């Protein structure tokens, strides 16, 4: 399963690690923060520097063929917008961080 995660912070990186450990998932992690991207590159996944609200960044991350998109940044408004954009680019299940905390 291809999972695209926007946000390489504690929540996003933790989800990515858990999904990679299952060994059934390909994970792409996307973040605007250069330091977060560098830290995440230590794991066995594709890590991209980019904005989750940038159509081209999502396409580069593989959103058009992704099975799941997870917006896990600490900015709820951006998470919601990113889920909408991801859904527009490819019909799949969008999950935002708030859904994970309930």
Model-found features: residue ranges?
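Cytosolic regulatory regions of ion transport systems
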Residues: 1-102
């Amino acid at each position: 399963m291809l999972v695209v995660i926007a946000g390489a912070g504690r929540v996003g990186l933790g989800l990515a690690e858990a999904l990679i450990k299952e060994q059934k998932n390909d994970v792409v992690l996307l973040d605007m923060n250069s330091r977060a991207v560098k830290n995440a590159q230590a794991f066995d996944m594709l890590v991209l520097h980019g904005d989750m609200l940038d159509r081209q960044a999502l396409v580069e991350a593989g959103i058009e063929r992704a099975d799941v998109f997870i917006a896990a940044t600490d900015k709820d408004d951006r998470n919601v917008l990113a889920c909408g954009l991801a859904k527009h680019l490819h019909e799949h299940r969008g999950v935002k961080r708030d859904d994970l905390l309930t």
